[in-house]
Amino acid sequence: MPIEAVRTAKVVLVGCVGVFGVLTGIDNILDYRTNFEVVHHVLSMDALAPNGAFAWRAITDPRLQRLAYAAIIATELLYGILCILGALRLAGGGRGPGVRSFDAAKGLSVAGLALGFALYFFGFLIVGGEWFQMWQAGQWNMQEAAFRFLGAIGLV
């Protein structure tokens, strides 16, 4: 397979992840209540048994819940922007002769992909899924969606 085809595929895929991150962040701002409700229920652990072994982990302060949601949105926007800028850098600066030029242009792309991966793996699967026991939260369990996002980013 020609190296230009592989490079073009990398640019397109990183750009797609970037658009996804920015679009997700913007959607969470425009339709704030929908996903804030998920964050609220996961952090407050109100869908779990009230006297469960992990009930002490619950965060019920609405200010802290809003702060957590703002951090999620900011991370989505940041990884998205980094990936878009990274894709543009790969498309432009990465077109020089040889592998070194393309490799030298990967920094923003790698940073954006790593941040997106960390959001869904650490933020949703580890913190949300395990610490706050989201896997037990019925309709508020967003682990499947997070895993899909994690898998897509991980493949890129």
Describe each PLM feature range.
Residues V6-V38:
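N-terminal signal-anchor transmembrane alpha helix
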Residues I81-V110:
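Cytoplasmic juxtamembrane regions at transmembrane-helix boundaries
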Residues A114-V156:
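Alpha-helical transmembrane segments of multi-pass integral membrane proteins
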Residues M1-A5:
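Short, Lys/Arg-rich, polar N-terminal cytosolic tail immediately upstream
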Residues K10-C16, I72, S109-L119:
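Hydrophobic alpha-helical transmembrane segments of polytopic
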